[in-house]
A protein has these predicted regions:
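Exposed beta-strand/loop interface patches that mediate assembly or binding
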Residues: 246-253, 257-386
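Surface-exposed cap/loop segments at beta↔alpha junctions
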Residues: 43-130, 144-145
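Short beta-strand-centered aromatic/proline hotspots
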Residues: 68-79, 243-253, 288
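Juxtamembrane "anchor/assembly" segments of surface/extracellular structural proteins
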Residues: 1-52, 93-97, 181-230, 243-253, ...
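Short beta-strand-centered interaction patches in the first periplasmic/extracellular domains
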Residues: 87, 94-96, 135-200, 351-355
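Amphipathic, non-transmembrane alpha-helical segments in extracytoplasmic/periplasmic proteins
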Residues: 33-34, 92, 106-130, 148-169, ...
Length: 465
């Protein structure tokens, strides 16, 4: 189809001064419209422009056939008085522009979710929105995804890049509709007289070509450009003899009442997208609370996470003070409810791990920084002070080692000391005191000493010197 007439919905232009439409794989579609309207329509149009409004740009050929060139949301406008008329300028954006406004902070911790289900979850907040995918997103499940300081559009493009795929806005309906991967395309064979230019993106090849698990070849960075009055779509395959490629960019201009299209083509491998990363999250720590603990892993709830009602099945490794592959090290897990931090060491949030617990409020036992303690929720405590070490259950039992006073063992229950070898109790420079409120009983085999008001010796022979 070759369009000769242009129709702009919602507005009646006396003359159309300028029309430009730019479309590119991975970017919002943009249209720029400029023309003259009647002065009497200015007030009515001003009221419309202050509301959210969708505009259809339609092309019509000589036979009356029409085709939607773009349905876009008004993203900007101006009204400029001119002699005998008013110039109206409009800037339109594809519906995906709605997804590129607010930055979000949310996590996806359900390891049973597919990437497609994640995208559909994001789409829900936009009402009129949907996605069509091609290339594995509907079958591949996530491990852990973190959207930090990213718009939904940035996050969606980053997800798609994990599969080497681009995101293409749909422009023929109102709403946030888009494709991930190869949009439905058709193949067209251009005439032999078609003129085209050829170029190579050498800079892109030098920075991208040899990297990744599936490196691209130099010829994958070839680009072909043709200008035509025929209307094609992104991802359409245009054959130019033995060359050609897939449409990755379209520039439409309406000049002298004639609509022309400039198409940029790339080989299919050249349509692949390199892995995108969120550099803002690299090296960051995020406050969280522990919800469950198992072995050396924890489940967490991130503070401020927008995705509050999700099913959390992701187990994060917990970092301790020291750990080695053979199992040696420090094993000390946090308790449910403890405040911790999620550490993201690099560009992949799946590599994140949980680190040290954070004490948010000062307790009565945390007043003196010279005191170091290790305490469980059951009250068992190991306390280090500048002049002592104390092990206690805080229920009447303790062992104290004090620099000035020595060692003290206190128990409100039995104390049992046993040995299969020799046992020596001695005092080299002072006294040895054995005291019992009821009795003292010392035994060895059949011999013994019993002190219970009276003193009783038992044995085959008793020698007193």
């Amino acid at each position: 189809m070759r369009a000769d007439k242009i129709h702009i919905s919602q507005f009646e232009f006396l003359t159309l001064e300028c029309l430009e439409i730019d479309r590119e794989v991975g970017e919002h579609a943009t249209a720029f419209i400029s023309g003259y309207i009647r002065d009497k329509d200015v007030e009515v149009y001003r009221g419309k422009l202050l509301e959210r409004m969708w505009v259809n740009i339609t092309g019509e050929d000589e036979e009356g056939n029409t085709q939607n060139l773009m349905t876009g949301l008004i993203a900007g406008f101006s009204l400029e008085p001119q002699p005998h008329a008013t110039r109206l300028t409009l800037t339109l954006k594809s519906g995906t522009f709605l997804m590129d406004g607010n930055k979000h902070y949310r996590s996806f911790q359900d390891t049973g979710l597919t990437y497609l289900e994640v995208l559909k979850t994001i789409n829900q907040s936009y009402g009129e929105a949907d996605v069509k995918v091609n290339g594995g997103l509907e079958a591949s499940t996530i491990d852990f995804l973190l959207q930090y300081n990213e718009t939904d559009w940035e996050f969606i493009r980053r997800i798609a890049s994990r599969f080497g795929m681009a995101v293409t806005p749909a422009i023929t309906r109102e709403g946030a509709y888009y494709f991930v991967g190869n949009a439905n395309f058709s193949t067209y064979t251009m005439s032999e007289s078609t003129r085209y230019s050829v170029s190579k993106r050498v800079d892109s090849y030098m920075t991208q070509g040899g990297s990744g698990s599936n490196p691209l070849m130099e010829q994958d960075y070839m680009e072909y450009r043709i200008t035509s009055r025929d209307i094609y779509d992104l991802w359409d395959r245009l054959v130019l003899g033995n060359e050609g490629g897939y449409v990755c960019k379209i520039q439409i201009k309406y000049v002298h009442e004639e609509l022309t299209h400039t198409y940029t083509l790339r080989p299919i491998n050249g349509m692949r997208v390199m892995l995108k990363s969120n550099m803002d999250q690299t090296g960051c720590s995020f406050l969280a609370s522990v919800s469950e603990v198992r072995q050396d892993r924890v489940k967490i709830e991130l503070a401020g996470d927008e995705n509050t009602g999700q099913n959390r099945t992701k187990w994060f490794p917990y970092s301790t003070g020291y750990s080695s592959p053979d199992g040696a090290g420090w094993y000390c897990m946090p308790e449910p409810g403890d405040r911790v931090r999620l550490q993201i060491p690099d560009q992949m949030e799946e590599h994140g791990y949980v680190i040290s617990s954070v004490h948010m409020e000062t307790g009565k036992d945390r007043k003196n920084p010279d005191h170091k303690s290790f305490k469980t929720k059951y009250g068992k405590e190991l306390l280090f002070t500048p002049d002592s070490v104390e092990l206690t259950n805080n229920k009447g039992m303790s062992i104290s080692i004090k620099d000035e006073e020595g060692i003290q063992i206190i128990s409100n229950k039995d104390i049992s000391i046993s040995s299969r070898g020799n046992m020596t109790v001695s005092s080299e420079d002072a006294s040895l005191v054995i005291a019992g409120k009821k009795q003292i009983n010392i035994k060895q085999g059949g011999s013994g000493l019993l002190i219970d008001k009276d003193i009783t010796f038992t044995g085959g022979k008793i020698r007193i010197q």
